[in-house]
C-alpha cells in the first residue's frame, strides 16, 4: 500500500517537475532574448527591410494614456529582439523547402526571379497580372473625363501634358512567373483601356510594346527588384523623347556596360540581399556626349531634383511620377535646358507656377492604379499628402 502511495507521489512529483521545466523554459524563451539582445545588438543586422516606417515608442503621457497599450504592442512587434535573424531563418526554410516566399507581397518565380505581387486597393499587381481587374465602361468614361479635363486646363496654361504607363515587371517577363499563378483572359486592365483612351485623342501612352521589342535581347528589369534597370528606363526615356520632341536615340547608338553585381528591393524585403546579389547592374554610357547636364537642386531623399543643361532645346520639362521616374534622371535632363523631377510625395500645383514647364510628363507604373485614376486630383492639389506610418 505504502509502495503504491510512494509511486504515485513520485509520479506526481515527476509530472510537477516536468510542468515547472516547461513553464521555466517558456518563460526563459521570452525573457532571455530581451536580456541578451542589448549585449549583442551592435553585432546583428538591424536594418528595416519593410516598405514602411517602423512604429515608434509610444508617448508616455496622460493625454496618450488610452493609446499606450496598442502603440506599445505595435512598437514591440516591430522591434522584437532578433527579429531579422528569425525572419531570415524562416525565409530561407520557405525558399529551400517550398520555393515560396514568406512575404505575401513577394512572389518567387522561375530561376529565382522575384516579383512584387502586392494585392491592395489602388495597387493590385497580382490582379493586373491575372487580368481580373478590368475597367467597367463607366470607369473608363470617368477616367477619360478626368484626363480630358487635365489636358484642357494644361493647354490653357500653355503646357503640353502627356501620361505614360510603365508595365509591371511580370507584364514584360511573364515567362519567369510561377505556373501556379494563373492568368485569365487575353488582355490586362491597361491592355484594354489605353488604346481606347488614345483613340479618343487623349495623350496617354503605353510603354509596354517598346519594352517587349527588346526584352528578349536585353534584360530590362532587375531580377531581384521591382524596377526597370538603366536599359529599360533608357528605352522608356526615348519613347518620351520621340513623343514630345520627335527625335530619339536607339540603343545601338549608346554603350551598355556591366558595372558590377546587383541585388534589389524585393531581396531586401525577404532579408536576403546578400544571398540574392548575382544580378548585374547595367549602365548606359555615351548618351548625347555633346550635351552636359548638371544638378542644381536636389532634396535629401532624391524625391525632388532640378537639372540644367546646355541642350539646344531651351524648353523646361516637368516629370512627375512614382519610383519608376527615378532612372529617367540619367537621360531626360540632356533633352531640355531645364528639367524638374518630382515624385508624388513632393509634387504640388505650385511647381507649375514656379518653373512654368513647357512639357509635363505624368508617369506611373502599371500597378499604381490609384495614381493613374486620380490624375485630376493629383495634378491640381495644393499640398503634399501625408505619408502612411
Annotate the PLM regions:
Residues 2-389:
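Extracellular glycan-modifying ectodomains
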Amino acid at each position: 500500500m505504502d509502495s503504491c502511495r510512494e509511486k504515485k507521489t513520485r509520479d506526481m512529483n515527476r509530472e510537477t517537475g516536468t510542468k515547472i521545466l516547461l513553464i521555466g523554459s517558456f518563460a526563459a524563451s521570452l525573457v532571455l532574448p530581451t536580456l541578451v539582445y542589448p549585449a549583442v545588438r551592435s553585432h546583428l543586422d538591424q536594418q528595416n527591410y519593410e516598405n514602411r516606417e517602423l512604429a515608434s515608442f509610444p508617448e508616455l503621457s496622460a493625454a496618450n494614456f488610452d493609446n499606450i497599450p496598442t502603440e506599445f504592442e505595435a512598437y514591440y512587434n516591430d522591434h522584437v529582439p532578433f527579429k531579422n535573424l528569425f525572419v531570415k531563418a524562416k525565409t530561407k526554410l520557405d525558399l529551400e523547402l517550398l520555393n515560396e516566399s514568406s512575404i505575401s507581397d513577394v512572389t518567387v518565380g522561375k530561376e529565382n526571379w522575384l516579383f512584387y505581387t502586392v494585392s491592395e486597393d489602388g495597387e493590385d499587381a497580382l490582379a493586373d497580372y491575372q487580368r481580373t481587374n478590368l475597367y467597367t465602361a463607366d470607369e473608363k468614361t470617368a477616367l477619360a473625363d478626368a484626363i480630358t479635363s487635365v489636358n484642357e486646363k494644361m493647354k490653357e496654361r500653355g503646357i503640353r501634358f502627356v501620361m505614360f504607363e510603365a508595365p509591371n515587371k511580370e507584364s514584360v517577363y511573364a515567362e519567369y512567373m510561377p505556373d501556379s499563378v494563373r492568368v485569365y483572359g487575353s488582355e490586362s486592365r491597361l491592355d484594354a483601356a489605353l488604346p481606347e483612351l488614345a483613340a479618343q485623342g487623349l495623350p496617354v501612352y503605353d510603354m509596354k510594346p517598346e519594352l517587349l521589342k527588346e526584352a528578349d535581347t536585353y534584360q530590362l528589369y532587375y531580377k531581384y527588384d521591382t524596377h526597370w534597370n538603366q536599359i529599360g528606363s533608357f528605352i522608356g526615356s526615348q519613347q518620351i523623347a520621340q513623343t514630345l520632341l520627335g527625335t530619339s536615340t536607339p540603343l545601338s547608338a549608346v554603350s551598355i556596360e556591366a558595372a558590377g553585381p546587383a541585388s534589389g528591393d524585393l531581396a531586401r524585403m525577404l532579408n536576403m540581399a546578400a544571398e540574392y546579389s548575382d544580378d548585374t547592374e547595367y549602365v548606359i554610357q555615351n548618351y548625347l556626349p555633346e550635351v552636359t547636364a548638371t544638378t542644381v537642386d536636389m532634396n535629401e531623399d532624391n524625391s525632388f531634383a532640378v537639372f540644367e543643361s546646355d541642350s539646344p532645346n531651351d524648353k523646361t520639362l516637368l516629370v512627375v511620377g512614382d519610383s519608376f521616374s527615378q532612372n529617367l534622371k540619367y537621360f531626360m535632363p540632356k533633352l531640355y535646358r531645364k528639367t524638374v523631377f518630382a515624385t508624388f510625395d513632393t509634387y504640388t500645383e505650385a511647381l507649375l507656377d514656379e518653373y512654368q514647364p513647357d512639357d509635363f510628363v505624368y508617369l506611373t507604373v502599371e500597378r499604381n492604379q490609384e495614381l493613374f485614376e486620380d490624375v485630376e486630383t493629383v495634378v491640381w492639389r495644393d499640398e503634399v499628402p501625408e505619408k502612411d506610418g
